[in-house]
């Protein structure tokens, strides 16, 4: 049996201007096992301070469904940060 | 909630062929087709647009388009739906989004088509960047509605 893990790995995706700020479209990160989407964003905002100004004008998704900021993450989840959509 | 398999829902990187989509949704039991053909305008807020680039969170965007199509069948008395959005670089005048809805009667087709484009613009994760002679900007968009925070336990995936 594998040892009990204290961290989980999730995939994070960036789109639009968020992708430009983060300089990447996706990456995998290890998080504490009770981490939620809000804390994941805070981690990126501390790494890329320019992101913080967009916190109130973006939404998140978890496993390709829109998700509230307090969604608790699980190993293997796919989280995306989505600017206001402008298709059409 | 899957759209009926007789619908066409897709994201494409090549030019959209409107005639084939319109022909596809047209059935002998129908009396009307309503089409929304969205294409690239040559200006934005008094600036001359050179071209646009669209990007999407592709698997989620396709799933959201399919949810919209499925909802149309539940909500309106329609026959078939075609909803196609193009991605990548688009030149002035090129179709970016094409929606065709067929129905026995026009009112349902109008209502469904209007609902489809309005909902697409508000909820499907697609983004457009506008290129001008002196730079580029991400287009203003709409923030999709998100289910409110809940303490419910999320089922394990």
For the regions a language model picked out, list residue spans one by one.
Chain A
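Ubiquitin-like/PB1-type beta-grasp interaction modules and other compact soluble beta-rich domains
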Residues: 1-87
């Amino acid at each position: 049996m594998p040892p009990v893990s204290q961290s989980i790995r999730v995939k994070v995706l960036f789109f639009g201007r968020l992708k430009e700020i983060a300089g990447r479209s996706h990456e995998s990160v290890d998080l504490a096992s009770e981490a939620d989407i809000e804390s994941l964003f805070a981690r990126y905002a501390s790494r890329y301070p320019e992101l913080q100004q967009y916190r109130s004008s973006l939404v998140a998704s978890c496993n390709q469904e829109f998700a509230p900021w307090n969604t608790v993450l699980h190993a293997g989840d796919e989280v995306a940060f989505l600017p206001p959509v402008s298709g059409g | 909630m899957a759209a009926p398999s007789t619908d066409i829902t897709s994201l494409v990187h090549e030019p959209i062929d409107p005639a084939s989509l319109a022909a596809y949704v047209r059935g002998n039991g129908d009396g009307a087709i309503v089409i929304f053909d969205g294409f690239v305008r040559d200006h934005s807020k008094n600036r001359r647009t050179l071209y646009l680039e669209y990007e999407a969170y592709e698997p989620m965007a396709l799933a959201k388009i399919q949810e919209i199509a499925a909802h149309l069948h539940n909500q309106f008395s329609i026959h078939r739906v075609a909803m196609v959005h193009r991605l990548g670089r688009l030149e002035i005048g090129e179709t970016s989004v094409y929606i065709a809805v067929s129905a026995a009667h026009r009112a349902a087709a109008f209502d469904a088509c209007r609902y489809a484009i309005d909902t697409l613009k508000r909820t499907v994760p697609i983004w457009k960047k506008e290129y001008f002679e002196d730079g580029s900007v991400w287009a203003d968009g709409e923030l999709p509605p998100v289910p409110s925070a809940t303490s419910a336990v999320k089922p394990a995936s």
